[in-house]
Amino acid sequence: MTGGHGHLTTEDLRAVAGEAYGRRLRSAQRLTGGTRKGVYRLTLDDGNTGIGYVWNDDENYWPSAEDPDRSTFADAAGIELFVAAHREIAETGVRVPGIVLLDRSRRLVPGDVAVVEDVRGGSLERLTVRDPDRAEPVLRRLGAAVRAMHSRTREHAGRPGAGASSPDRPVEHVARDRALRHLAAVARRVDRIAQVRDRLAGALRERCAVLAPRARFGLIHGELGPDHVLVDDHDEPVLIDVEGAGYLDVEWEHAFLELRFGERYHHLAVGGLDVDRLRFYRLALHLSLVEGPLRLLDGTFPGRAGMLAIAEHNIGRTLAQLD
């Protein structure tokens, strides 16, 4: 397990605010939901605000796990992934919070730090509940952003950045083997999955076997739910939690978008998707969304009810794939 989860205080973050803005920090509030980094709203003495990201062991709730395919699907954390993904997405014209400060010195706080623009319009998830009519054009703009990202392609899968590695075998084989590992882990914990483990393993192998390797891959966010989209003062969508971005079969993204946006997915849909890839990635995705939350709950993450709900929902989705 990573560190002891000692969150930072206003006093701890004064030097960060001073370095970023040249002003005194009035208060620092840790925002909820982060599992791999600390997210803090920094309120300055003039009333303006910024957002601080802190990466260190104490802010990371995830138990360490071996992953032989780190180039493509591994848990995404760290300032270098953030910087590379932020740059890559911004170059497509898609809005991400502006960067105010990057500090890797560990002099300001015990960890790597980024300070970014505070987009105060709230999340798209909340907007769809609070004002569905206002959310509709934001969703359409988000669809355009998704398509702009997908249009940025390259010949090898993996994370962005000059030093990023790529898998040495077809992406669908990487996804299959990862899903089989997730299935094995989940079957040890969930009797309903254990009872049909062989059928699920067979379905993964069969769905993967019909896929032909691809020569180009599109840019995806990786975890693009409405909670990872903020809305700015002009009702433009702003993508956050971008560290998982990379080049991959775009069907992986759309399997996730279908799940997270539900009846509003049509705003984000694109033509020409490979239906066989979608079918394969849906099953792999549901297994990952059981394994991940259950593994996170091996530690001290405080949002336990929410993670259990995600796992339970995706257990049902996984079993439904056998119908």
Residue ranges and their predicted role:
Residues T32-R36, Y40-S166:
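ATP-binding pocket architecture of kinase catalytic cores
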Residues L8-R24, R104-R107, R130-R140, R147-I220, ...:
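An alpha-helical support segment within catalytic cores of ATP-dependent transferases
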Residues G47, G111, A215-F217, D235:
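Conserved catalytic motifs of the protein kinase core domain
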Residues T2-D45, R152:
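Charged, low-complexity intrinsically disordered tails and linkers
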Residues Y61-S64, F217-I220, G225-F280:
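Active-site Asp-x-Gly
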Residues A185-R189, Q195, L289-D323:
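ATP/Mg2+ or Mg2+-diphosphate-binding catalytic cores
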